[in-house]
Amino acid sequence: KRVSIFSPGEIVIQNVGNWLATADKLGEFVGKTYFLKKDGTKINAKISIRPTFADGKSNAQTGYCGVTEVIDEDITVPINLSTKIIKGVAITRVPFTSASIFPMLAIAAYYAGLGDGLFSVTSLLLAVFGVLLLHLSSNVFNDYFDVSDGTDEANNEYFQPGGAAITGGSRAIELGIITLNKTKTVAISLLLASLLVAGFLFYNIYQVTGATSNVEGALAVGLSGLFLGYFYTARPLRLVARRGLGELAIFLAFGPLLTLGTGYAISAETIGFLSNEFYMLLSLGVPFGFLTTNILYINQFPDAESDAKTGKNHLVVTLGKKAARWGYLVILSLAFYSSVYLNDLLNVHENFNSNVFLVGNAVLYLFGLSIFMKLLKNYQKRELVNANIQTIILQTLFCVFYIISLNLFFI
């Protein structure tokens, strides 16, 4: 049994690594802690941890041996602020919010490249904060529903290099960091906070534009994103289990809808429905949507067996791992094709350099192809984790490249 099953999650995060390091260095760690029964009552204990070896200390270490002695002393383990922050990051998966925040900054760069005074900085800050909260809420809701459906519990092949959750959800509930019910409470709280920020944002949009049309557009896009994020794993729709609808939801929510919504939120002018600017904002989101979808897509490979057992029939389960490899290449190629397509549309702007844009796209596409080659080779191996991480890096680099290339005022 893992110690995290019966030890408070905060104690595991804060202390277990140091306990094991001390055992490695000194040959034994001796200390006091407490464990929890299923009913929540404490078991105060003295613990001893020693490293174990294959056949004597001259051979490879095979693990650790722990001895627990129940004691009468009431043990308390102070939890540091840094541990509480790490706990919050683990539960909400904060690092993944770069997938939503960076495309928003790219739209701000687009407006800055067009000229001065074309977007509201206040609206941008409110929009980024609101989307951040909404994204975190969606992450936590997804964990809640995946655990409720038994998907995460059935998954023993997830990737967590260095403790960072890459696939298989946050594992926060499984590690005892938070309970299932508290997960739902956190998700709802984050959602309500995002709606509160949205209220301030809508007021500022009206103050900037003097009209309600952008407010209505931002509201419609925001509700659409909320719908897709919630029902990605929530029943009765559970889009992730509907053979491609989950991937489509991610593409829309982190692509065209995100960039269009950002435009509605920050533009100093009203955006007409189906106007040229409306289509431009949608088009700018297409490559972002594809690259973010590929993050989700490649993360489905290590989880495929457990997902199939629990009815989570996404594209990798539907196609089978071997055939699904080529889906990554298709999505990657569509991302960069749609990006290069934007070259002619953007080339009319003063602070845009077509050569820089095309060369940057070519370099990043080659990086993407190198990731695809790793997927081709390692799709059934633990070494695939490198491709998973690099897919996240690719999406981030692409966003940063867009932020720079859409406003090359210094060239």
Name each model feature, range by range.
Residues 11-14, 21-32:
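PAS/PAS-like sensory domains
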Residues 141-192, 289-333:
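Solvent-exposed interhelical
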Residues 345-410:
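Extended hydrophobic alpha-helices typical of membrane-associated regions
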Residues 162-163, 168-271:
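Intramembrane alpha-helical segments
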Residues 47-65:
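Short loop/turn elements at sensory-signaling interfaces that couple input to output
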Residues 34-40, 53:
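PAS-family sensory domains
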